[in-house]
A protein has these predicted regions:
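Dual-mode signal for accessory low-complexity, basic/Gly-rich regions
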Residues: 277-449
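Active-site bordering "gate/hinge" segments
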Residues: 1-302, 306-309, 318-321, 401, ...
Length: 449
């Protein structure tokens, strides 16, 4: 059970009183209201290729963004200079700019009664000492060595390991003050199999908030090598209309299209293909898609949103029915709805499709002829109409089994139909902020080459 806290940690390197002073200075300069967002970030990244170090990059910096409101006009400015004189100049510039821009009828801070006053502890920082470059390089080396040991791997694009930590704090002139720290680790490897023009490339990666949740480097490497070798000697296929199965490495992208379509700003502008579908069946019965900002150690977790509003778990698709938009303050006001704690810009948090009942093997067992996709190319998705067309490669399914690799295909459909004809497997993993298990979609069009 998450434990609520009322006192956010002070960001390192800055006194929280400075942010409170900014609010006072903004009011004194003529602003009706204001908000300040502070970020202190640190990162370290290393990469190696064929056993030799290729990259070592580290950074540390602070950034402050101030947004001032004069009536229904607002302006945002940012600075990395925290000297008092520079901050006062920043305030004056923000207020002057706000006076000069057109009015936005939907602009403004959240009412004080809606602001978050307590929030859960989400375990977003493992509090380890920052890893050294040598430690990260050892992770990358282990991953690449494991990949190159896979029979059939002939070359490497390298392996990369990185660490980051960010401390964020938000203060508003009407009483909100909150902050939290987020850590992150990532490891990736990409290799080639085969020779000459018959080479094939693939990869594996892992990201986590805690180091202990990162995939073992040797497994990252072995997977990358195995995936690349499995793509060798692809065949072409003829045009067809068949079931298409998306490997779970790709299936989260389908949810990305959904998140874009239910973003309140697009709905308010009338540019979403789902704009008229609230409360309707857009997936099959039994399908549930969740936005959960309170997932422990979640890569998209957040105790409050970018506008100081409380966050909570929501089933945006429940039993196949669309139940909510993802709303920040501006889009909520425009649509005359309550905000959902997805500010700013209506972005999701940990967005995932709940797992189904069948294993991936069982999901394809009754497919006489079909396509199992392991890679997608291009971005041919129209968010206004839902039309979908992308290049693809993967494996041909024959009599319920992955039979041989295929490439040079184009798959096409419309997201409205694809959503309705989607069936999830039971292999959900949380590898990013948007996740889905392997999914099967009936009746997609395939064009060979």
């Amino acid at each position: 059970m998450a434990k609520p806290t009322k006192k956010p940690p002070l960001p390192p390197g800055v006194d929280a009183d400075i942010l409170a002073d900014l609010m006072k200075w903004a009011k004194a300069a003529g602003a009706d209201s204001a908000e300040a967002f502070y970020v202190h970030g640190e990162s370290l990244s290393v990469a190696q290729r064929l056993g030799k170090r290729e990259k070592l990059e580290g950074s540390e910096g602070r950034d402050l963004r101030l947004r001032a409101f004069v009536g229904k006009c607002s302006a945002s400015v940012s600075s990395t200079d925290f000297a008092p004189k520079a901050l006062r100049t920043l305030v004056e510039r923000a207020v002057d700019m706000a006076r000069a821009v057109p009015e936005d009828p939907y602009a403004g801070l959240a009412p004080a009664e809606l602001l978050a006053t307590n929030w859960p502890e989400l375990d977003l920082d493992d509090k380890r000492r920052p890893p050294s470059a040598r430690t990260l390089l050892a992770l990358a080396a282990e991953a690449e060595d494991a990949a190159r040991s896979v029979k059939g791997v002939t070359n490497s694009e390298g392996a990369e390991a990185s660490w980051s930590r960010s401390t964020m704090m938000l203060v508003t002139s009407n009483g909100f003050s909150g902050g939290y720290r987020r850590g992150g680790y990532s490891l990736s490897c990409a290799v080639l199999a085969g020779e000459g023009t018959a080479m094939e490339r693939d990869y594996e990666w892992s990201s986590a908030v805690h180091f202990d949740d990162l995939m073992a480097p040797a497994k990252v490497g072995r997977n990358a090598g195995r995936f690349a070798v499995g793509r060798l000697n692809p065949k072409k296929v003829s045009n067809a209309r068949v079931p298409v199965v998306y490997d779970r490495r790709l299936a989260g992208g389908m949810l990305g299209h959904l998140a874009g379509a239910i973003n309140g700003r697009g709905v308010a502008r009338g540019t979403s293909f789902l704009k008229d579908r609230m409360g309707q069946q857009i997936f099959a019965k039994g399908i549930r898609i969740v936005d959960n900002p309170h997932r422990q150690r979640g890569l998209g977790s957040r105790p409050f949103d970018g506008e100081g509003l409380p966050t909570k778990r929501r089933a945006v698709i429940d039993d196949g029915v669309l139940t909510t938009w993802l709303l920040d303050l501006a889009s909520a006001r425009q649509l005359k709805l309550a905000p959902t704690g997805n500010g700013s810009q209506g972005s999701p948090s940990n967005f995932y499709l709940e797992k189904g009942k069948l294993s991936p093997d069982a999901l394809i067992a009754d497919i006489k002829s079909g396509l199992y996709i392991t890679d997608l190319i291009g971005f041919g998705v129209n968010g206004v109409t839902g039309d979908y067309s992308r290049g693809a490669s993967g494996f041909w399914i024959e009599n319920g089994k992955k039979a041989w690799p295929v490439s040079g295909l184009t798959i096409a459909g419309n997201l409205k139909d694809m959503f309705l004809n989607l069936t999830p497997a039971n292999d959900l993993q949380f590898k990013s902020s948007t996740n889905a298990p392997t999914v099967r979609i009936e009746g997609m069009t395939i064009a060979g080459s």
